[in-house]
């Protein structure tokens, strides 16, 4: 007897390892086309830009390292057209839908869902259900080492490369900045706390995956997600993506850990 096919939504924070998971699921050809559908701002049609991540920061030594804002092109799609795009773009021919949602994107998702007809309720859980079509399997990816996560984020903000390896020249121009890393740590901790509070409030018990476990057991974890969404676990591929961190990232992590206590910065 065939099992029920279910959609899934990966819940995470930036640089937590979620891309490693969703790209491995995508590679199966049977687990949807998981994308970060809910990151695009209607005002620009773009994901948040470096300066938007540092909104409210007035430290010029940070701001001078960030690219200027791009005005983009406003997204004028109707709410129903937007929902249809999300549904069709995330689905493989077998009917499985996959996607990824960061905590900082939840307010925008709720705002866009509020304009849809025939709502099933209020709040984030109803918004997810009304956009996707039904309740997904929730998969929570998190990274216990938030300092390494923040360093990875800070490098990506400067190079503007969020997956794969950046251009060596631009990567060499990325600059260590303890204050910027601290700002990102606070942001990431707030986001992760948001997810955990929401799980408790809604009584949700997601598939919980820590990055170190994911990295060491990728094929087995992908198999477990496939099983949860009604697909053959044997389709889980061998590891694909390479680790983006390198010796320079490790040096920045060590330097920040050494400096943070003296500077009163979070770790």
From Swiss-Prot:
Keyword match Cell division: no
First-tier enzyme category under EC: transferase
Protein's GO biological process: 3'-phosphoadenosine 5'-phosphosulfate metabolic process; sulfolipid biosynthetic process; trehalose metabolic process
Name of this chain's protein: Trehalose 2-sulfotransferase
Listed pathway(s): Glycolipid metabolism
Active site: 36
Quaternary data: Homodimer.
Knockout mutant characteristics: Loss of T2S and SL-1 formation. Unsulfated acylated precursors of SL-1 are not detected, which indicates that Stf0 acts before lipid addition to trehalose.
Sorted UniProt keywords: Carbohydrate metabolism, Transferase
Superkingdom of this protein's organism: Bacteria
MF GO annotations: 3'-phosphoadenosine 5'-phosphosulfate binding; protein homodimerization activity; sulfotransferase activity
SUPFAM superfamilies (alphabetical): P-loop containing nucleoside triphosphate hydrolases
InterPro entries: P-loop_NTPase, Stf0, Sulfotransferase_Stf0_dom
E.C. code: 2.8.2.37
Catalytic activity: alpha,alpha-trehalose + 3'-phosphoadenylyl sulfate = 2-O-sulfo-alpha,alpha-trehalose + adenosine 3',5'-bisphosphate + H(+)
Residues annotated to bind alpha,alpha-trehalose: 14, 33-39, 48, 53
Physiological role: Catalyzes the sulfuryl group transfer from 3'-phosphoadenosine-5'-phosphosulfate (PAPS) to trehalose, leading to trehalose-2-sulfate (T2S). The sulfation of trehalose is the first step in the biosynthesis of sulfolipid-1 (SL-1), a major cell wall glycolipid and the most abundant sulfated metabolite found in Mycobacterium tuberculosis, that is a potential virulence factor thought to mediate host-pathogen interactions.
GO cellular component, one term: plasma membrane
Signal peptide from the UniProt entry: none
Family the UniProt entry places it in: Belongs to the Stf0 sulfotransferase family.
